[in-house]
Protein backbone atom coordinates (compact mmCIF):
# COMPACT_ATOMS: atom_id res chain seq x y z
CA UNK A 1 0.00 0.00 0.00
CA UNK A 2 1.16 3.49 -0.79
CA UNK A 3 0.75 6.13 1.86
CA UNK A 4 1.20 9.76 0.84
CA UNK A 5 2.14 11.71 3.92
CA UNK A 6 0.23 14.94 4.21
CA UNK A 7 -2.29 14.10 1.48
CA UNK A 8 -5.41 11.99 1.32
CA UNK A 9 -5.09 9.28 -1.30
CA UNK A 10 -3.98 5.68 -0.85
CA UNK A 11 -3.64 3.03 -3.53
CA UNK A 12 -2.45 -0.48 -4.18
CA UNK A 13 0.45 -1.18 -6.51
CA UNK A 14 0.07 -3.37 -9.57
CA UNK A 15 2.71 -6.00 -10.22
CA UNK A 16 3.14 -6.43 -13.95
CA UNK A 17 4.40 -9.33 -15.99
CA UNK A 18 7.12 -11.89 -15.60
CA UNK A 19 10.78 -12.17 -16.42
CA UNK A 20 12.13 -13.85 -19.51
CA UNK A 21 15.74 -14.96 -19.50
CA UNK A 22 17.92 -13.97 -22.43
CA UNK A 23 20.59 -16.52 -21.52
CA UNK A 24 18.42 -19.47 -22.65
CA UNK A 25 18.91 -18.78 -26.37
CA UNK A 26 20.85 -21.38 -28.42
CA UNK A 27 22.77 -18.55 -30.11
CA UNK A 28 26.56 -19.07 -30.21
CA UNK A 29 28.53 -17.10 -27.58
CA UNK A 30 29.68 -13.69 -28.74
CA UNK A 31 33.30 -12.56 -28.81
CA UNK A 32 33.08 -9.06 -27.31
CA UNK A 33 35.57 -6.44 -28.50
CA UNK A 34 38.33 -5.30 -26.16
CA UNK A 35 37.79 -1.53 -26.35
CA UNK A 36 38.77 -0.20 -22.91
CA UNK A 37 41.97 -0.20 -20.89
CA UNK A 38 42.77 0.73 -17.31
CA UNK A 39 44.58 4.05 -17.56
CA UNK A 40 45.15 5.02 -13.93
CA UNK A 41 43.96 4.53 -10.36
CA UNK A 42 43.87 7.32 -7.77
CA UNK A 43 43.39 7.22 -3.99
CA UNK A 44 40.38 9.01 -2.51
CA UNK A 45 38.71 9.08 0.90
CA UNK A 46 37.69 5.97 2.79
CA UNK A 47 35.20 3.63 1.11
CA UNK A 48 33.76 5.69 -1.78
CA UNK A 49 30.14 4.92 -2.66
CA UNK A 50 29.58 7.14 -5.71
CA UNK A 51 31.51 9.19 -8.26
CA UNK A 52 30.43 12.01 -10.59
CA UNK A 53 32.08 14.21 -13.21
CA UNK A 54 31.90 17.92 -14.05
CA UNK A 55 34.20 20.85 -14.78
CA UNK A 56 34.20 22.35 -11.29
CA UNK A 57 36.97 24.94 -11.77
CA UNK A 58 35.96 26.16 -15.25
CA UNK A 59 39.26 25.27 -16.95
CA UNK A 60 37.68 23.15 -19.69
CA UNK A 61 38.87 19.85 -18.20
CA UNK A 62 36.77 17.12 -16.60
CA UNK A 63 37.03 16.84 -12.81
CA UNK A 64 35.87 14.07 -10.46
CA UNK A 65 34.13 13.97 -7.10
CA UNK A 66 33.37 11.01 -4.82
CA UNK A 67 31.29 10.44 -1.69
CA UNK A 68 33.29 8.59 0.97
CA UNK A 69 31.02 6.92 3.48
CA UNK A 70 33.53 5.87 6.16
CA UNK A 71 35.36 9.15 6.78
CA UNK A 72 32.46 11.57 6.20
CA UNK A 73 34.07 13.31 3.26
CA UNK A 74 33.96 14.16 -0.41
CA UNK A 75 37.07 13.80 -2.57
CA UNK A 76 37.54 16.34 -5.35
CA UNK A 77 40.09 15.54 -8.08
CA UNK A 78 40.88 18.24 -10.62
CA UNK A 79 41.61 16.96 -14.12
CA UNK A 80 44.63 17.84 -16.22
CA UNK A 81 42.80 17.12 -19.48
CA UNK A 82 44.88 14.09 -20.45
CA UNK A 83 43.30 11.42 -18.26
CA UNK A 84 45.42 12.27 -15.25
CA UNK A 85 44.13 13.97 -12.13
CA UNK A 86 45.69 15.91 -9.29
CA UNK A 87 45.76 14.55 -5.74
CA UNK A 88 42.31 14.65 -4.19
CA UNK A 89 41.13 17.58 -2.10
CA UNK A 90 39.10 16.55 0.94
CA UNK A 91 35.80 18.24 1.77
CA UNK A 92 34.20 17.36 5.09
CA UNK A 93 30.48 16.63 5.05
CA UNK A 94 27.77 15.26 7.32
CA UNK A 95 27.88 11.66 8.47
CA UNK A 96 28.04 8.85 5.92
CA UNK A 97 27.68 10.56 2.52
CA UNK A 98 26.33 7.96 0.12
CA UNK A 99 25.00 9.62 -3.04
CA UNK A 100 25.12 13.00 -4.75
CA UNK A 101 23.23 14.91 -7.43
CA UNK A 102 24.94 17.64 -9.48
CA UNK A 103 23.03 20.65 -10.79
CA UNK A 104 23.00 24.44 -10.67
CA UNK A 105 20.78 24.93 -7.64
CA UNK A 106 21.31 28.68 -7.09
CA UNK A 107 21.21 29.88 -10.71
CA UNK A 108 24.75 31.24 -10.96
CA UNK A 109 25.83 28.98 -13.83
CA UNK A 110 28.17 26.87 -11.68
CA UNK A 111 27.84 23.24 -10.64
CA UNK A 112 26.50 22.64 -7.13
CA UNK A 113 26.12 19.46 -5.06
CA UNK A 114 23.25 17.84 -3.21
CA UNK A 115 24.63 15.09 -0.97
CA UNK A 116 22.57 12.31 0.63
CA UNK A 117 24.13 11.70 4.06
CA UNK A 118 22.61 8.50 5.42
CA UNK A 119 24.26 8.60 8.85
CA UNK A 120 23.01 12.08 9.74
CA UNK A 121 19.61 11.76 8.00
CA UNK A 122 20.28 14.84 5.88
CA UNK A 123 20.48 16.22 2.36
CA UNK A 124 23.40 18.66 2.42
CA UNK A 125 23.88 21.42 -0.18
CA UNK A 126 27.25 22.71 -1.43
CA UNK A 127 27.48 25.65 -3.83
CA UNK A 128 30.23 25.74 -6.42
CA UNK A 129 32.67 28.60 -6.93
CA UNK A 130 34.45 29.31 -10.22
CA UNK A 131 37.80 28.17 -8.78
CA UNK A 132 36.50 24.70 -7.91
CA UNK A 133 35.91 25.31 -4.23
CA UNK A 134 32.53 24.90 -2.56
CA UNK A 135 30.55 26.93 -0.07
CA UNK A 136 28.28 25.20 2.40
CA UNK A 137 24.55 25.57 2.00
CA UNK A 138 21.60 24.48 4.07
CA UNK A 139 21.10 20.95 5.38
CA UNK A 140 17.64 19.41 5.11
CA UNK A 141 16.67 16.78 7.65
CA UNK A 142 14.91 13.65 6.40
CA UNK A 143 13.71 10.58 8.20
CA UNK A 144 15.52 8.41 7.72
CA UNK A 145 18.82 7.43 6.05
CA UNK A 146 18.77 8.83 2.50
CA UNK A 147 20.29 6.24 0.17
CA UNK A 148 20.01 7.89 -3.25
CA UNK A 149 19.29 11.38 -4.54
CA UNK A 150 18.62 12.75 -8.03
CA UNK A 151 17.64 16.12 -9.47
CA UNK A 152 15.38 17.49 -12.19
CA UNK A 153 12.62 20.02 -12.79
CA UNK A 154 9.50 18.35 -11.39
CA UNK A 155 7.07 21.27 -11.51
CA UNK A 156 7.96 23.09 -14.73
CA UNK A 157 9.38 26.25 -13.15
CA UNK A 158 12.85 25.73 -14.70
CA UNK A 159 14.41 25.34 -11.24
CA UNK A 160 16.01 22.02 -10.27
CA UNK A 161 14.23 19.95 -7.63
CA UNK A 162 15.36 16.90 -5.65
CA UNK A 163 14.03 13.40 -5.08
CA UNK A 164 15.58 11.22 -2.37
CA UNK A 165 15.09 7.55 -1.56
CA UNK A 166 15.00 6.90 2.19
CA UNK A 167 15.85 3.59 3.82
CA UNK A 168 12.55 3.39 5.72
CA UNK A 169 10.48 2.86 2.55
CA UNK A 170 9.91 6.54 1.80
CA UNK A 171 10.47 8.88 -1.15
CA UNK A 172 11.01 12.56 -0.29
CA UNK A 173 10.55 15.46 -2.73
CA UNK A 174 12.18 18.89 -2.33
CA UNK A 175 11.11 21.69 -4.67
CA UNK A 176 13.85 24.14 -5.61
CA UNK A 177 13.37 27.88 -5.22
CA UNK A 178 16.17 28.71 -7.66
CA UNK A 179 18.32 30.47 -5.06
CA UNK A 180 19.82 27.34 -3.50
CA UNK A 181 17.00 26.83 -1.03
CA UNK A 182 14.27 24.20 -1.18
CA UNK A 183 10.67 23.83 -0.07
CA UNK A 184 9.57 20.45 1.17
CA UNK A 185 7.27 18.72 -1.28
CA UNK A 186 5.22 15.56 -0.83
CA UNK A 187 6.68 12.52 0.89
CA UNK A 188 5.52 9.04 -0.12
CA UNK A 189 5.67 5.83 1.88
CA UNK A 190 5.86 2.80 -0.39
CA UNK A 191 7.86 -0.27 -1.38
CA UNK A 192 10.61 -2.11 0.48
CA UNK A 193 13.99 -0.45 1.00
CA UNK A 194 14.34 1.85 -2.02
CA UNK A 195 17.93 1.73 -3.27
CA UNK A 196 18.05 4.04 -6.30
CA UNK A 197 16.02 6.80 -7.96
CA UNK A 198 16.09 8.12 -11.53
CA UNK A 199 14.05 10.69 -13.48
CA UNK A 200 12.93 10.75 -17.13
CA UNK A 201 9.83 11.66 -19.15
CA UNK A 202 8.45 8.18 -19.73
CA UNK A 203 5.04 9.03 -21.22
CA UNK A 204 6.16 12.01 -23.33
CA UNK A 205 3.86 14.53 -21.68
CA UNK A 206 6.68 16.95 -20.83
CA UNK A 207 6.69 16.04 -17.13
CA UNK A 208 9.43 14.08 -15.40
CA UNK A 209 8.52 10.63 -14.14
CA UNK A 210 10.29 8.61 -11.46
CA UNK A 211 11.74 5.10 -11.34
CA UNK A 212 12.63 3.57 -7.96
CA UNK A 213 14.37 0.24 -7.39
CA UNK A 214 13.16 -1.63 -4.29
CA UNK A 215 15.98 -3.80 -2.96
CA UNK A 216 14.50 -5.17 0.25
CA UNK A 217 13.77 -8.87 0.86
CA UNK A 218 10.00 -8.40 0.47
CA UNK A 219 10.08 -6.73 -2.95
CA UNK A 220 12.20 -7.42 -6.02
CA UNK A 221 10.62 -4.75 -8.19
CA UNK A 222 11.09 -1.38 -9.83
CA UNK A 223 8.34 1.16 -9.22
CA UNK A 224 7.29 3.65 -11.91
CA UNK A 225 5.76 6.89 -10.65
CA UNK A 226 4.18 9.12 -13.31
CA UNK A 227 4.72 12.81 -12.63
CA UNK A 228 1.85 15.28 -12.52
CA UNK A 229 4.04 18.25 -13.44
CA UNK A 230 3.54 20.00 -10.10
CA UNK A 231 6.10 18.08 -8.02
CA UNK A 232 3.73 15.25 -7.13
CA UNK A 233 3.40 11.75 -8.56
CA UNK A 234 0.54 9.36 -9.27
CA UNK A 235 0.22 5.98 -7.60
CA UNK A 236 3.09 3.74 -8.76
CA UNK A 237 3.12 0.61 -10.87
CA UNK A 238 5.56 -2.18 -9.98
CA UNK A 239 7.49 -4.32 -12.47
CA UNK A 240 9.17 -7.48 -11.29
CA UNK A 241 12.97 -7.49 -11.56
CA UNK A 242 15.71 -9.92 -10.69
CA UNK A 243 16.54 -10.44 -7.05
CA UNK A 244 17.56 -7.42 -4.95
CA UNK A 245 17.56 -4.56 -7.48
CA UNK A 246 20.16 -1.97 -6.49
CA UNK A 247 20.33 0.59 -9.30
CA UNK A 248 18.09 1.93 -12.04
CA UNK A 249 18.70 4.09 -15.12
CA UNK A 250 17.31 4.75 -18.60
CA UNK A 251 18.33 4.26 -22.25
CA UNK A 252 16.82 3.29 -25.63
CA UNK A 253 17.87 -0.35 -26.03
CA UNK A 254 15.86 -1.23 -29.16
CA UNK A 255 16.30 1.97 -31.18
CA UNK A 256 12.61 2.83 -31.38
CA UNK A 257 13.01 6.30 -29.90
CA UNK A 258 11.21 5.29 -26.69
CA UNK A 259 12.87 5.32 -23.28
CA UNK A 260 13.62 1.89 -21.83
CA UNK A 261 14.66 0.87 -18.33
CA UNK A 262 17.81 -0.77 -16.96
CA UNK A 263 17.89 -2.35 -13.48
CA UNK A 264 21.01 -3.84 -11.86
CA UNK A 265 20.22 -6.86 -9.64
CA UNK A 266 22.52 -7.45 -6.67
CA UNK A 267 21.81 -11.17 -6.42
CA UNK A 268 21.71 -13.86 -9.11
CA UNK A 269 24.37 -11.89 -11.05
CA UNK A 270 22.05 -10.29 -13.58
CA UNK A 271 20.57 -7.10 -14.94
CA UNK A 272 17.02 -6.60 -16.18
CA UNK A 273 15.89 -4.48 -19.12
CA UNK A 274 12.34 -3.29 -19.71
CA UNK A 275 11.31 -1.99 -23.13
CA UNK A 276 9.14 1.09 -22.92
CA UNK A 277 5.81 1.51 -24.65
CA UNK A 278 6.04 5.30 -24.75
CA UNK A 279 3.03 5.84 -22.50
CA UNK A 280 4.78 5.30 -19.16
CA UNK A 281 4.26 1.54 -19.18
CA UNK A 282 6.82 -1.17 -19.93
CA UNK A 283 6.90 -4.65 -21.39
CA UNK A 284 7.87 -7.60 -19.19
CA UNK A 285 11.50 -7.52 -18.16
CA UNK A 286 14.28 -9.62 -19.67
CA UNK A 287 17.16 -10.85 -17.52
CA UNK A 288 20.70 -10.89 -18.90
CA UNK A 289 23.89 -12.17 -17.30
CA UNK A 290 26.53 -10.08 -15.56
CA UNK A 291 29.48 -11.18 -13.43
CA UNK A 292 29.52 -11.85 -9.67
CA UNK A 293 27.81 -9.28 -7.46
CA UNK A 294 26.67 -6.47 -9.80
CA UNK A 295 25.92 -3.28 -7.85
CA UNK A 296 25.70 -0.39 -10.32
CA UNK A 297 25.59 0.23 -14.04
CA UNK A 298 24.98 2.66 -16.87
CA UNK A 299 24.16 2.62 -20.56
CA UNK A 300 26.07 4.11 -23.49
CA UNK A 301 27.27 3.41 -27.01
CA UNK A 302 30.73 2.00 -26.31
CA UNK A 303 31.61 0.61 -29.76
CA UNK A 304 30.26 3.32 -32.07
CA UNK A 305 27.48 1.27 -33.66
CA UNK A 306 24.74 3.65 -32.44
CA UNK A 307 23.28 0.92 -30.22
CA UNK A 308 23.00 1.13 -26.44
CA UNK A 309 25.43 -1.02 -24.47
CA UNK A 310 25.69 -1.57 -20.72
CA UNK A 311 28.62 -1.14 -18.30
CA UNK A 312 28.34 -2.80 -14.87
CA UNK A 313 30.61 -2.91 -11.82
CA UNK A 314 30.68 -6.20 -9.90
CA UNK A 315 31.70 -6.02 -6.26
CA UNK A 316 32.33 -9.74 -5.74
CA UNK A 317 34.36 -10.44 -8.87
CA UNK A 318 36.16 -7.06 -8.60
CA UNK A 319 35.68 -6.15 -12.23
CA UNK A 320 33.93 -4.00 -14.80
CA UNK A 321 31.70 -5.76 -17.34
CA UNK A 322 30.86 -4.31 -20.76
CA UNK A 323 27.82 -5.94 -22.38
CA UNK A 324 27.18 -4.98 -26.00
CA UNK A 325 23.63 -4.36 -27.20
CA UNK A 326 22.18 -5.90 -30.35
CA UNK A 327 19.69 -3.09 -30.93
CA UNK A 328 16.61 -5.21 -30.25
CA UNK A 329 16.69 -5.08 -26.47
CA UNK A 330 18.94 -8.13 -26.11
CA UNK A 331 22.67 -8.29 -25.42
CA UNK A 332 25.67 -10.32 -26.41
CA UNK A 333 27.12 -12.84 -23.98
CA UNK A 334 29.60 -13.24 -22.38
CA UNK A 335 30.52 -9.69 -21.35
CA UNK A 336 34.00 -8.26 -21.72
CA UNK A 337 35.44 -8.01 -18.21
CA UNK A 338 38.16 -5.68 -16.95
CA UNK A 339 39.89 -6.12 -13.61
CA UNK A 340 39.33 -3.29 -11.11
CA UNK A 341 40.72 -2.56 -7.67
CA UNK A 342 38.87 -4.21 -4.79
CA UNK A 343 35.19 -3.54 -4.30
CA UNK A 344 34.02 -1.55 -7.34
CA UNK A 345 30.77 0.02 -6.18
CA UNK A 346 29.75 2.74 -8.65
CA UNK A 347 30.43 3.74 -12.25
CA UNK A 348 30.11 7.03 -14.14
CA UNK A 349 30.77 8.14 -17.73
CA UNK A 350 33.92 10.15 -18.33
CA UNK A 351 34.75 12.49 -21.23
CA UNK A 352 38.27 13.86 -21.49
CA UNK A 353 38.96 16.89 -23.65
CA UNK A 354 42.43 17.63 -24.94
CA UNK A 355 42.42 20.60 -27.27
CA UNK A 356 39.79 19.91 -29.93
CA UNK A 357 39.60 16.16 -29.22
CA UNK A 358 37.15 14.43 -26.88
CA UNK A 359 37.95 10.94 -25.63
CA UNK A 360 35.26 8.86 -23.90
CA UNK A 361 35.91 6.68 -20.89
CA UNK A 362 34.54 5.34 -17.63
CA UNK A 363 35.42 5.88 -13.98
CA UNK A 364 34.71 3.47 -11.13
CA UNK A 365 34.53 4.14 -7.39
CA UNK A 366 36.30 1.25 -5.66
CA UNK A 367 34.81 0.95 -2.19
CA UNK A 368 37.12 -1.59 -0.55
CA UNK A 369 40.28 -0.09 -2.09
CA UNK A 370 39.36 3.55 -1.31
CA UNK A 371 40.24 4.56 -4.85
CA UNK A 372 38.85 5.47 -8.25
CA UNK A 373 39.90 3.84 -11.52
CA UNK A 374 39.92 5.59 -14.90
CA UNK A 375 39.27 3.49 -18.00
CA UNK A 376 39.87 5.04 -21.42
CA UNK A 377 38.64 3.91 -24.83
CA UNK A 378 41.06 2.48 -27.38
CA UNK A 379 39.48 4.00 -30.45
CA UNK A 380 36.50 6.32 -30.13
CA UNK A 381 37.70 9.92 -30.30
CA UNK A 382 35.84 12.82 -31.80
CA UNK A 383 36.50 16.43 -32.77
CA UNK A 384 34.73 18.95 -30.55
Task: Write out the residue ranges for each language-model feature.
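Hydrophobic beta-strand segments that make up the repeating blades of beta-propeller
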Residues: 64-67, 113-116, 162-165, 210-214, ...
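Beta-propeller blade termini
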Residues: 49-58, 78, 98-105, 147-156, ...
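Short glycine/acidic-enriched loop and turn motifs that connect beta-strands
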Residues: 70-72, 119-121, 168-169, 216-219, ...
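Bacterial N-terminal signal peptides
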Residues: 10-20
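Glycine-aliphatic tripeptides that mark coil-to-beta-strand junctions in extracellular
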Residues: 60-62, 109-111, 158-160, 206-208, ...
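Blade-level signature of beta-propeller repeat domains, shared across WD40, Kelch, NHL, RCC1
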Residues: 345-384
Amino acid sequence: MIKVIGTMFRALAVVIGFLSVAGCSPREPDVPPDLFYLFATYPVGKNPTSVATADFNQDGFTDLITTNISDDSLSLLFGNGDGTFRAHVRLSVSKEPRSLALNDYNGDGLTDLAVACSGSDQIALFFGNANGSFGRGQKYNVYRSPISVTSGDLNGDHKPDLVAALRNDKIAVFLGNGDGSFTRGPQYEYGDTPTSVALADLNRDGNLDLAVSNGGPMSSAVSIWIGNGDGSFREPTDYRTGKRPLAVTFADFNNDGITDLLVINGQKDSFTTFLGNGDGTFQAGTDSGADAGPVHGLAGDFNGDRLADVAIVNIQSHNLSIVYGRGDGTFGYPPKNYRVKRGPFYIAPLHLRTGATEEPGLVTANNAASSISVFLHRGLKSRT
